Structure formats: structure tokens, C-alpha cells
From Swiss-Prot:
Its cofactor is FMN. Keywords: Flavoprotein, FMN, Oxidoreductase, Pyridoxine biosynthesis. This is Pyridoxine/pyridoxamine 5'-phosphate oxidase. It comes from Roseobacter denitrificans (strain ATCC 33942 / OCh 114). FMN binds at residues 49-54, 64-65, 71, 93, 128-129, 172, 182. Its EC number is 1.4.3.5. HAMAP family: PdxH. InterPro entries: Pyridox_Oxase (IPR000659), Pyridox_Oxase_CS (IPR019740), Pyridox_Oxase_N (IPR011576), Pyridoxamine_oxidase_dimer_C (IPR019576), Split_barrel_FMN-bd (IPR012349). It is an enzyme of class 1 (oxidoreductase). Substrate binds at residues 54, 111, 115, 119, 178-180. Binds 1 FMN per subunit. It holds the Pfam family PNPOx_N.
């Protein structure tokens, strides 16, 4: 493959990402929207964890979390992050690097309202990333939040989304004999024009 044809075709990397994700939703056994999110702490020590991508916007990727969690503190502190989506069923992956901002308005409210009642109550109950004495203590907090918020809990003030606005997106597809296909989209700033380059495997 010498041109960006087939699975790599298109003038918008977000459209390509949406297309690959749609294919993965048909073929991947579990959590096709899982991403390995990488951050760094105040000392520059890297961290990584799996989270679920919840939206591909026209210029950003969106996920939701507890704003008091370790990941949120690191995202707020650095203002930058990276993630990778990898699908064994498709033998493809997407790598993203970019700037981070909060998604803390109507979109966050709407997504929170779409979650199951137990998930919404769990968001209120969990003091994410902090020490927990026992699972029984966690379930007691869930019961307390159930009594407090009933069947229609609003979004907690400490819970919401993050938008990663990329300056780099790489699309990778497996090739025979490890001769993979790689195309990277880069721009200087989120407002700049994209430039596409084929990379060696």
C-alpha cells in the first residue's frame, strides 16, 4: 500500500477513527471503546490505566471520570495526555497525543443521566483512588447514597468528562511479516492544519 486507500482513506482523522471504532464494535468481544490512557504526575512519573472512550467529537475524544481521582489530578496538572486503542480482532490500533480540557457542562450532565441508576449511585459513593477499608464499607456508602439521592441522582460536582484534543493521531494496521502500515496525522496546535505522513513499520 503506497497511498492512503481502503481503511486509511479520508480527509478527516476523526472520521477514520469513528469508522474503525464502528468496525471494532462489530468484531471485538469486549469493550471495543477501551483505551489505555497515559498521564504523568507532578514529578514526571508516568501512569497508565484502561478507561472507556465515550465520544468522538468533531475535534476531540471524550471520556468521563471522577475529578478527584489520580488520573484527573494528573490530567489537570499536565494539561496533556496520550492514549492507544488496540483491537485484536481487527489487528489495528490508533494512538493519540494531545491537549486536555474538562467536559463539565450539558454534555456531561446528559451522559451521566444516560447511565444506569446503580452506576450513578456508585459515582456518588466512590471516593476514587483513595484508600478503602473494605468492600463492605463501600457498599454501606452506596446504601447511604441511595437513601440520600433516591432514583434520580444528579451528576456529582466532582464527576465529569475530559476532552483530548489531538495534535497527533497515528493509525496502524498489521501487515504480513511485520511490514505494518502506519500513517500519522500531525498538527502544531489544535487550530493548525493536519499533515499526514507514512511511517516505516
Amino acid at each position: 500500500m503506497t497511498e492512503r486507500t481502503g481503511k486509511f482513506a479520508g480527509d478527516n482523522p476523526f472520521t477514520i477513527a469513528e469508522s474503525w471504532l464502528a468496525e471494532a464494535q462489530e468484531s471485538e468481544v469486549n469493550d471495543p471503546n477501551a483505551i489505555a490512557l497515559s498521564t504523568v504526575d507532578a514529578d514526571g512519573m508516568p501512569n497508565a490505566r484502561m478507561v472507556l472512550l465515550k465520544g468522538v467529537e468533531p475535534d476531540a475524544f471524550v471520556f468521563y471520570t471522577n475529578y478527584e481521582s489520580a488520573k484527573a489530578r494528573e490530567l489537570d496538572g499536565a494539561g496533556k495526555a496520550a492514549f492507544v486503542m488496540h483491537w485484536k480482532s481487527l489487528r489495528r490500533q490508533i494512538r493519540v497525543r494531545g491537549h486536555v480540557s474538562r467536559e463539565d457542562g450539558d454534555a456531561a450532565d446528559a451522559y451521566f443521566a444516560s447511565r444506569s441508576l446503580k452506576s450513578r449511585l456508585g459515582a456518588w459513593a466512590s471516593k476514587q483512588s483513595r484508600p478503602l477499608s473494605s468492600r463492605a464499607a463501600l457498599m454501606a456508602e452506596v446504601a447511604k447514597m441511595t437513601a440520600t439521592h433516591g432514583t434520580n441522582p444528579k451528576r456529582p460536582p466532582f464527576w465529569g468528562g475530559f476532552r483530548i484534543t489531538p495534535v497527533e493521531i497515528e493509525f496502524w494496521a498489521d501487515g504480513d511479516f511485520r511490514l505494518h502500515d502506519r500513517f500519522v496525522w500531525r498538527r502544531e496546535t489544535p487550530q493548525s492544519e493536519w499533515h499526514v505522513t507514512r511511517l516505516n513499520p
